[in-house]
Amino acid sequence: MTMSKTVKLAQHLEQLHINNMYKNDFYWTWDKTDEELEAIFTVADALRDLRERNRSTRIFDSGLGISIFRDNSTRTRFSFASACNLLGLTVQDLDEKKSQIAHGETVRETANMVSFMADVIGIRDDMFIGEG
């Protein structure tokens, strides 16, 4: 029996020095090492391979992905929702008008508070247009 592409990709991941990626925020690609970026693309390849072979990519039985999108977005919003679904998470969009942000709470404070309930938080804020 031949080894599946996913198994080979998992073995490749074990060879990379990516220990500081677990439970760590991902803000900018320029903060990542070459091996960390390689790991990200390797995981994407493994997920694609699983999906193409009609294998489950869900690593969560249930859970919550919260999106805080401060700027209008189509591709990023749908990409985040698709990724959450692929992993088994339900997406909840944070509506700033219905949150404490409308009353002066910072996005950082809000994200910190909801992080206790979420498995992942996606934030889209064009603070640095054209960077990252």
Regions found by a protein language model. Give the residues of each.
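Positively charged, low-complexity intrinsically disordered leader regions
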Residues: 3-78, 82
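Generic N-terminal leader/processing signal
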Residues: 1-3, 122
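Phosphate/diphosphate ligand-binding glycine-rich loop within oxidoreductases
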Residues: 58-132
